[in-house]
Every structure is written in C-alpha cells, then in structure tokens.
Amino acid sequence: MTDLTSLTLAEARKGLAAKTFTSLELTDAHLSAIEAARVLNAFVMETPDRARDMAREADGKIAKGDAGPLAGIPLGMTDLFATKGVRTTACSKILGNFVPTYESTVTSQLWRDGAVMLGKLNNDEFAMGSANETSCFGPVGNPWRREGSNTTLVPGGSSGGSASAVAALLCMGATATDTGGSIRQPAAFTATVGIKPTYGRCSRWGIVAFASSLDQAGPIARSVRDSAMLLRSMAGHDPKDTTSVDIPVPDYEAAIGKSVKGIRIGIPKEYRLDGMPAEIEKLWSEGAAWLKAAGAELVEVSLPHTKYALPAYYIVAPAEASSNLARYDGVRYGLREQGKNIIELYENTRAEGFGAEVRRRVMIGTYVLSAGYYDAYYLRAQKVRTLIKKDFEDCFAKGVNAILTPATPSAAFGIGEKGGADPVEMYLNDIFTVTVNMAGLPGIAVPAGKDAQGLPLGLQLIGRPFDEETLFSLGEVIEQAAGRFTPARWW
C-alpha cells in the first residue's frame, strides 16, 4: 500500500470513498509520523485517543453512505482555536493549562464535516511573530534544510507549527490564522499552500484574539485543491461573530482547473524593492509568464501607499493587541502570580506570563493609544489604512481581477538568525503580506520554485473581496507549472 501520509487530501478522500483504506488506518499512519517527528516541535499537544475515536466514527458514516465532505481526514489545529475539553494556550505561559468548555466555530464546522483532530499545533505566542520562535513551547523546526547543511531553519510564523506539520506530512491539512501574513509567509517558507480569506469569510468566534480588525482564519494544505476543500468547510456566516459576513460560501473546488483566459493580473511596481534578491525577482517574472501562457492578461498597476503599510500595521496591530490582552490578569483563569495587593497580582502575572515579544507589542500598543500620542500615531495609521484599501479598490475598479506579488522577501532563515538586536529586521518579513490584512482582502501563497540553496519560495496572489475562487483558479496554474515540492526527510 502507498504510504498513506504522502497522499493529498483529495487523494485520501477518494481512497476512503473507495474503501481502499480506512480512516483509522489513515489516522494511525499520521499519528506514527507525528511520533517520529517530535524533533520538529510542530505539535504542542497530541490527541491520539480522540483522533482514533473520531476516525472510527467517520468509518461508520462512510460505511453507511452518510459521510461529510472531510469524513475521516486527519487534521491539525493551531493552538489559537478553542477545542472543547482539549488544552488551548495560544502558546503562552499566561494561559497555563486552560481547557475551554466550548468549541470554536471553525473547528465545529470541521468536525461537522467529519474531520479528525490529531492534536494542537505550535504557533508564535498569541500569533505575534514571523518565525515561530516566541512560543512558550519553544521554536518549531522547518522540515526543509539548505542543501549540504544541518542548520535547522524557521518555518515562518505565526502559524509555523501548521506549515511544518503539513510540509513534513504529519497531517493532511491544518487550521491557521493570519493577522499580517501568518498563513502565507509560513506556507511560502515550507512549500505548502496557505490562503487568508477575505475578512469576515470565516468566523473568529472561539479563536484567541490578537488584532480583531485584522485576524482571519484559513487553512494550510499540501495543494491548491486541498486548501479549497478545507476553506469550504471553515467558511460561513456565524451570528456569534459580528464581523462575519452573511453571504453564500461557493464550491471553491469547482474553481480548480477553470480557464483563466482573459483574467487581468496586476503587477504592482511598488513591490519591486531595493535590494530584493535576484531569485525572488526571477520567480516573480516566471510566475507572471506562467499565468500569461495560460491566457491571463498582465498589466502594471500602482499601489502608491504600499511603503506606509508596514509601519501603519505595526501601530494598528499592537494597539488592538494591548486592548485584547488586557483580559489576561490572573484572576479568572490561567497563570496567577501572587502579590501583596490586586495591582501587584496583575503586574506579577503579566510580567511572568507574557513573553518578551508580546510584552513589547503590548507596550507599543498602550503607547500609541495614550492620550498624548493617539492622534500622532494611531489615528494617522488608520488614515493610512484607508488609503491602502483605496489603492486596491482603484486597481480593481480598472478591471484588474487579481494581483501577483512575491510572498516573502527571502527564503527561510536559521532559528535565532534574525531580530535578536533589532525587532524591525524580523518585522520586515511581512512586507509583502500586511497590505492584504490592512485592506481585508483574500490572499493565497503558492509554492513556485526554490532558491540556490534548495529552499522553497512562494508567490502571492491577492484577490477582490470575497473572490477566493479566482485565487484558487490562478493558484492552480502556478502549481501545475512549478510542480509540488517535498523536503528530504532528516528527522
């Protein structure tokens, strides 16, 4: 029998339907793979008993012909999604051994469709990071290595555990969240496919909040088709989330293989950065050529406020985080560090419970929201955000259907290599992705090639609001042209 972990989600669905193998066999294969890959530190909690119970239930439904669209498919859940009865910590010491008494909307919908939970995945603490180095459970290793090197690289962040687990064939797909690039950047670093849907497409209810006006859930998967299948189950209106949009969820899988003839692709001149590696520039040109060969039309476009996106993002996101994280005080749940009085209890708990990067962002956020600086920083950043959104609206109003850019400014780097002395060095990893969150648009990262050291590189496609279908159609063109990449196993 084929190694079951090497199948795509779509192939596994066919095999389960044909009864070539059972969900229990598929789940056991992935549980064994997880056990053998603990050095990657992708999972922070494994749930083998629950996984086998869910797999048996899926097998029963498949036998009766009553199976959901993801019946029997083993998935990993980022540790930001509330999972009833299973520890959820946002990879922060401050949440301790918090066990939710409720299920997030997104995970509920995956279980409704028959998916199997293998466990909880590592992520940057409260999703704050671009390398999955800020987790209280330690850094995640990228299954990819530079040719001829034993250096362990970062998988990107904040959803590094999701990307690493999918790339290392530990799960068939994973949930993730994207606030400034946390799905797309790790996907590009690991040769996986990651889509950040339009803001409001997936419910945020039951997901630990970082920056509420920017956070959006999405999947990381092995192929464009797999990500389309997962998004269909994850998306949908939820009255429990006031930002959830009540519009029908299309059959995203139907967009795969659809002709892209006549689709207008914008190439934004502002994304050509000084000092951009020649490999990234070449990959971008190749991606454009593949889309043109498939019948798409290329047009140069201008997004003039792009250069202000990163500084504006690093004002808006920490401001919202400082408000959202005020609830972690050691009183009702999670870590509690005693003090002589209530103020000291708060101070001790937060000082001990939050990691350095989270403390930094909370302090930045508190500063920009303070009375003397609100107008100078936060208000101006929100005005810039409006201008960034308008840049995209103007571009789409001229008939552009999607925009092609690089996903990241480089390939993956070594653990501890960046951001030690200067956090801005790490923040620059988000340079191509933050605009999408600021404008609330959908964006997909697709593997498109490798650098000179054999590390994967990705391209990003940005779409019109709620037009994820076009991104799947275009993403599949890039996937077909570039091929799929898997890392050589070293663990």
Curated annotation (Swiss-Prot):
UniProt KW Heme keyword: no
Catalytic site positions: 158 (charge relay system), 182 (acyl-ester intermediate)
Protein name: Glutamyl-tRNA(Gln) amidotransferase subunit A
Native source organism of the sequence: Bradyrhizobium diazoefficiens (strain JCM 10833 / BCRC 13528 / IAM 13628 / NBRC 14792 / USDA 110)
Key words of the record: ATP-binding, Ligase, Nucleotide-binding, Protein biosynthesis
Domain of life: Bacteria
GO molecular function: ATP binding; glutaminyl-tRNA synthase (glutamine-hydrolyzing) activity
Claim: ATP-binding is one of the keywords in the record: yes
Pfam families referenced in this protein's UniProt entry, alphabetically: Amidase (PF01425)
EC number: 6.3.5.7
GO biological process: translation
Function text: Allows the formation of correctly charged Gln-tRNA(Gln) through the transamidation of misacylated Glu-tRNA(Gln) in organisms which lack glutaminyl-tRNA synthetase. The reaction takes place in the presence of glutamine and ATP through an activated gamma-phospho-Glu-tRNA(Gln).
Subunit structure: Heterotrimer of A, B and C subunits.
EC class of the enzyme, as a word: ligase
Family according to the record: Belongs to the amidase family. GatA subfamily.
PROSITE patterns found in the cross-reference section: AMIDASES (PS00571)
One GO cellular component term: glutamyl-tRNA(Gln) amidotransferase complex
Reaction(s) this enzyme catalyzes, per UniProt: L-glutamyl-tRNA(Gln) + L-glutamine + ATP + H2O = L-glutaminyl-tRNA(Gln) + L-glutamate + ADP + phosphate + H(+)
